[in-house]
Amino acid sequence: MRKTKIILIIILFFIGSFSALKFTRSYFSDTEKVLGNSIQVGTWGESAPTSTPTPTEGTPTPETTSTPTPTSTPSNLADHVVISEIMVKGDSADDEFIELYNPTSSNVNLSSWSIQYRGGGAATYYRKNFEANDIIPAHGFLLIGNTAYNGSVSVDMIHNTFSLSSDGGTVFLVNNQTTLTDAADNGPTVVDKVAYGTGTSLRPEGSAYSTAPAQNQSIERKAYSTSDTASMTSGLDTNKGNAYDSEDNASDFVLRTTSQPQNTSSTTEIP
């Protein structure tokens, strides 16, 4: 009887050990991981998956701001009154004019200045003085005409001191009323000068504008270095003034097939 109890106890011990071992393996066969509010079940011996952070929505993306390219300023624009257009012959030999342009933002009083001329083959300088109230407006014009001038635009100053040669000559704008000499015609009193055509006595800035305008034609100062006859007569530079001055008459002017005189009452033009 005692032997039977011992055998029974041994059997129960083995049964209990087997059950405990089975329970333990079952318990550890699955790994439980709590992530946030969810449970992830993995297989024994494997690493639990790692959660990947979700990108925050609504985070602004930096924008690249482009830097504007500065607008270039046209070069060689005069900062003083210039001779802007010359017609040497209209309906008659003395139907002629000289036009001035003021590219500055202030009126300029010319009452103590003079306009002077020397023919292409001559040795004499001729002078016509400006008078009181000869004021050229800011970005405006002033028109000087011979007594034989008969254009539709009225002159601001009329004279019969000289006649522009149809072959060639030099026009001087001088800031005093002293007649020029060979020694002074390139000096500081000469504000501007323009030589056109041919002649041994031409006194140009740089080179003369070699073409002498024909009847009713004129030579006109450019608005910019890129200006040409088309842009000055019917293109983008028509109303941009006549400020270009590279100190070379040959480069600074274009030939107009039809002259276009402007006076102090004409619309101002800003370069």
Q: How would you name each of these model-derived features?
A:
Residues 2-67, 71:
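Short, polar/proline-rich extracytoplasmic segments that appear immediately after membrane translocation
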Residues 13-16, 76, 236:
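Residue-level detector of alpha-helix boundary/anchor positions
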